[in-house]
Amino acid sequence: MCTLDDPFFARIHTVCDRPEEMWDAVMSYKYGEDRSWADVLGRILVGFLDERREDFERYDVITTGAIYVGPRAQRLWDYLSLILDAAARQGPHWPFAPGLIAKSGPTARFLGISPQARQRIAEGELRAALSVPAPARIVGRRVLVFDDVYSEGFSLREMARVLLAAGATEVAGLVLTRRKGG
């Protein structure tokens, strides 16, 4: 549950109600670089959206959380876009639009550090690195931001902040699983 004073996002939707199993899949995909998980996770995502169509039809666009893949990046592939690309093949009726939020450079990892350290990174270097390169694509729209794991909401808050400043009317999160320290 989000305990942020001003989260900037309306709510968080969680795809999987079996967090340990989904965490294992995310770890294998993201850190083990087993890219075959992209299709599986894309199918799971579309199944979740289809089952709850009434809840998600209100969103105008579904985008990915910001990932940096340039020089000095920790990972040279956009694991969230691969999932949304797979989801778009399974559910072309959903308004998937990866990459509407840009991250201009690498930031420190959140995995394995304290919530206070994650908050400092989010409110410092992450906030400074985020932008919306094409604001016309989100102005006046309700945006759903897809990410793999939700911990305390620090990253999502910063992405919601930049989207709202660029003209989005509402921002919510959509994550595969929740895990403290994820």
Language-model segment annotations:
Residues M1-G182:
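Glycine-rich phosphate/pyrophosphate-handling loop used in enzymes and phosphotransfer proteins
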